[in-house]
């Protein structure tokens, strides 16, 4: 590098950095190219894509890799900022489809649906459920700030936060995997921190102190089980290991 600079060879083409506006416009192409309709759920395809062609598939996932609802909110917000009617229209199709067809009988998100195989995963995860709530509370807060309300979505999120409280264990943890009837499939509490932020957001939005108390319990669990022991080991692929990525939320 020094050799090139000393001879005036540094960046011959005098490249200029792209502006934030330009980059957002380019990246927003994902919201259009990945948009999938024709199923009971409308979504942006973003899970298990083939790198050779990035062709959309029939897998719709709330949270984790798919982040269907968070993608919809990001597109919605950017659509308003940039006056993109196409993005706003697509985002609302996602929200409307999940409001109508995206919840289980109890009220959890249908977090992982594969329309290619006609399969809906009957086992829920605290991480995907939490990240779905997180996304929708961002949407509701944004809408409220701009003078718009969505009573049906507010009721759905209130119900979800209430049923999360039923899942919380005495030590403050949340089971990693569970079914719609609250049967616990995986008792490990490694993904507990993923629930902390949506609980705090729920408290801020709904002014319900129970959610803040629950969030504090998750923080206490995190401190006692993870931080004080300083035993971060293995990887997030290990179900018996704490989810470090999720803990960053807390």
Annotate each predicted stretch with a short phrase.
Residues 86, 120, 148-152, 183, ...:
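A structural signal for alpha-helical segments
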Residues 2-9, 13:
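Single conserved hydrophobic/aromatic residue that forms the stacking wall/gate
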Residues 69-85, 131-149, 194-209, 249-250:
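Well-ordered alpha-helical scaffold segments within catalytic/enzyme domains
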Residues 192-229, 240-250:
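Active-site neighborhood of glycoside hydrolase catalytic domains
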Residues 15-58, 86-109, 153-175, 209-232:
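Long, well-ordered core segments of solenoidal/helical folds
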Residues 77-80, 103, 141-145, 169-173, ...:
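Short, flexible helix-adjacent loops and helix caps
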